[in-house]
Amino acid sequence: MTPRYVLAIDQGTTSSRAILFDRAGDIVGSAQREFAQIFPQPGWVEHDPREILTSVYATLTELLSREQIDPRHIAALGITNQRETTVVWDRATGQPIHNAIVWQSRQSHAICERLKCDGHEARVRERTGLLIDAYFSATKVRWILDHVEGAQQRAERGELLFGTIDSWLVWNLSGGQAHVTDYSNAARTLLFNIHTLDWDDDLLALLDIPRAMLPQVRDSSTVYAHTRPQFFFDHPIPIAGIAGDQQAALFGQACFLPGMVKNTYGTGCFMLMHTGTQAVRSRNGLLTTIAWGLDGRVEYALEGSIFIAGSVVQWLRDGLRMIERASDSQALAAQVPDSGGAYLVPAFVGLGAPYWRSDVRGAMFGLTRGTRKAHFVRAALEAMAYQTRDVLDAMQSDAGIALTELRADGGAIGNDFLAGFQADILGVPLLRPRLTETTALGAAYLAGLAVGFWSSREQIAAQWGLDRRFEPQMEVARREKLYAGWQQAVAATLAFHVD
């Protein structure tokens, strides 16, 4: 039976989705399930790995049932995932020994500070392309081994496995056939040497993490395993593509040439520049990371990671109850000509690139008696654009490339106000693709390439379609005045920090 579709699992920070794509790269159907966010202490964020699995299984079942898809028509399954989020589970039982520690969580901050104080940052940066920060997986693993009784000894005996969410999903979907990850996810652990393309024994020794816990690292487009018999009506489907969410979006945006840049506006905000086969070291607080491994060759990227972006709208809705629906933010922001001088710095769990300060917290500046709800909401949306400008300026400096356009995706960029303001504050056109679900599309493309469903990257690039081009309309003087106000607000936020 001729395959017609590729299935993608997009396992995100707040929900899991299953999306089915046809050969043209169009969405045939999708399903989504949210799951609980666990906040044991301020600054800590956890997920129940079993609930993540349940949410994934539910979306797969719902999608195939509702669309009445014959599983024999599915060529392959691709996985994209929230990166850095860490799961440790029992090799024999498959049960996690602790909640997953989410990428946003700061609970391993003290471990990071010790590593910095002991002078390890330069070595870690040189080998991994990353900074020592609680954002990445390594210190999360160390925290779990320290806080679960007997975990260190069990890990040393080979009884425990570590993985990012992709590894956890493949292990379970395949019935334990494969303990694997891909280069893009491995590069986010703070344990992987991006130059030798292997787990770094010195870094493992530094954190006392047994190598036996770690997954095998493979290309981002290859057959890792097949789904276990009880899935998909006893028809095994090849699991053939894996990429961390931001690298998957870069692939889905067809940013295949050095210098091409995309920004994903999701829970966080993430800008990636493709740098080809060269690992460009940042001098401005950006990360050097692996974009993907394809056809036996690794390609690199520069990344600026912003911790809080679209989730600020969720905070307006659920925390402050200023809006009933996330979509209400666009209409409210449009009610006022500007933010009334208000700036929101959403450092709820610290500031990411290019500042990397985990000890600061969110702040609001410029409030007056005339500040209304619309000003507050507008300031929250504008904060996403200002943070992106911070990263873009650093990226241009590192790469020596003046950008001519930005390809944007993710749920928040469907907000026309945000898209237009982003183009204004950057001073370059923002291109929103016809299909904004580029993260899942990238995972589908990687899986489809592995099994011959798509023939080449050239075919994929030809399928990229434009929905709308947002040209900058703001005068340069006004743009720079607004941005200077943002920089002043950030400086004040950095001056007020917590222990």
Swiss-Prot record:
Its name, as the record gives it, is Glycerol kinase
Q: What class of enzyme is it?
A: transferase
Q: What is its EC number?
A: 2.7.1.30
Q: Where does sn-glycerol 3-phosphate bind?
A: 13, 83-84, 135, 245
Which keywords label this protein?
ATP-binding, Glycerol metabolism, Kinase, Nucleotide-binding, Transferase
Pathway field: Polyol metabolism; glycerol degradation via glycerol kinase pathway; sn-glycerol 3-phosphate from glycerol: step 1/1
Which parts of the sequence bind ADP?
13, 17, 267, 310, 411, 415
> Which reaction equations make up its catalytic activity?
glycerol + ATP = sn-glycerol 3-phosphate + ADP + H(+)
Q: What is the regulation of this protein's activity?
A: Inhibited by fructose 1,6-bisphosphate (FBP).
Gene Ontology terms describing biological process: glycerol catabolic process; glycerol metabolic process; glycerol-3-phosphate metabolic process
Judging by the UniProt lineage, the source's domain of life is: Bacteria
* Residues that hold ATP according to the record: 13-15, 267, 310, 314, 411
Instruction: Supply the source organism for this entry.
Output: Stenotrophomonas maltophilia (strain K279a)
Q: Which family does it belong to?
A: Belongs to the FGGY kinase family.
Recorded GO cellular component terms are: cytosol
Residues given in the record as glycerol binding sites: 83-84, 135, 245-246
Report the protein's function: Key enzyme in the regulation of glycerol uptake and metabolism. Catalyzes the phosphorylation of glycerol to yield sn-glycerol 3-phosphate.
Molecular function (GO) terms listed? Answer: ATP binding; glycerol kinase activity
